[in-house]
Amino acid sequence: MTGTTTARSDDDSWDIASSVGATAVMVAAARAAETRSASPLIQDPFAQLLVERAGSGAWSVLASDGLRQQLAELDPDADRVMQYAVDYQAVRTRFFDGFFERAAHAGITQVVILAAGLDSRAYRLDWPAGTTVYEIDQPLVLQYKRHTLDAHDVRSACLRREVPVDLRQDWPAALQREGFDVAEPTAWLAEGLLMYLPTEAQDRLFELIVDQSAPGSRIAVEAVGPDNDKRQEFRSKMRAHFDRARKLAGMDGESLDVGSLMYHDENRTDVPQWLAGRGWTVRAIPAEVEMAEAGRPGYIEEDLRGNTLIEAELKG
């Protein structure tokens, strides 16, 4: 395998328009596009608001049906890549929405969303009375989301607590300062996160989650497949397509190189095995299987598969 390096550093930070923060805008744009579609798998009425105030980027094409139509006519392959991004995010979002619904039905009212980005579940899901949702992310990212939704009088459907801290820092202490109770079962979410952590940080993250989890807790995770030459080639093609989308939207420059923000570490810990070895009951579903079952099989090649959607429970 040809190795790749990351543009990240141990103490880097970002706002919503730069680095890892900009990837949250792309994900929100995909949710907005899915919500506007004829037969949406999800409903995120706040995604469009969050994208529109984030400035210009390749996401502007996803946020505009008119630009998408132009892209489809000028570059069908680029539009197909865009649609795959929308389909994947829709299926992933639906899976984790279901996770929270199941956790709520089990009586869990303490929720932690790690690297929350522009996640709007605190606002759009039907939470039981007494639910507290803790959102952990960079301070400027959380601030942008709060200011944007406050400006439109959008109110959360639960008690929402911001925890403005980097996950490479002492986030458990920050979480507890906001009222988190280690004695209560928790529903944890790590969605679209692990690829942006080096192996050691990923392992430490899960160790801390387990330390903070009372019996009855649940966790949902998106685990990424191993990096290889085929994935690197695919990312390069995607970036070229997004560059064309930017030009269509009247923007200069190149698209964000998402691959340069990731940590392409070999021998990452197998998340399902790791959790099972610590007493968690694990259900792991290949992402392509979940996509097929949702009627969104996509077009990715065999070598690009490998992402896994995971749900686990620590029995009481």
Swiss-Prot record:
Q: Which GO terms describe its molecular function?
A: methyltransferase activity
A GO BP annotation: methylation
Enzyme Commission code: 2.1.1.-
* Residue sites binding S-adenosyl-L-methionine per the record: D137, D166, L167
Q: Which InterPro entries match?
A: Ppm1/Ppm2/Tcmp, SAM-dependent_MTases_sf, SAM_mthyl_Trfase_ML2640-like
> What EC class is this?
transferase
Decide whether keyword Transmembrane helix is in the record: no
Q: Which UniProt keywords apply?
A: Methyltransferase, S-adenosyl-L-methionine, Transferase
> Which Gene3D superfamilies has this protein been placed in?
Vaccinia Virus protein VP39
Query: NCBIfam families of this UniProt entry?
Result: mthyl_TIGR00027
State the function annotated in the UniProt record: Exhibits S-adenosyl-L-methionine-dependent methyltransferase activity.
Sequence similarity = Belongs to the UPF0677 family.
Q: What is this protein called?
A: Putative S-adenosyl-L-methionine-dependent methyltransferase MAB_4606c
* Protein species of origin: Mycobacteroides abscessus (strain ATCC 19977 / DSM 44196 / CCUG 20993 / CIP 104536 / JCM 13569 / NCTC 13031 / TMC 1543 / L948)
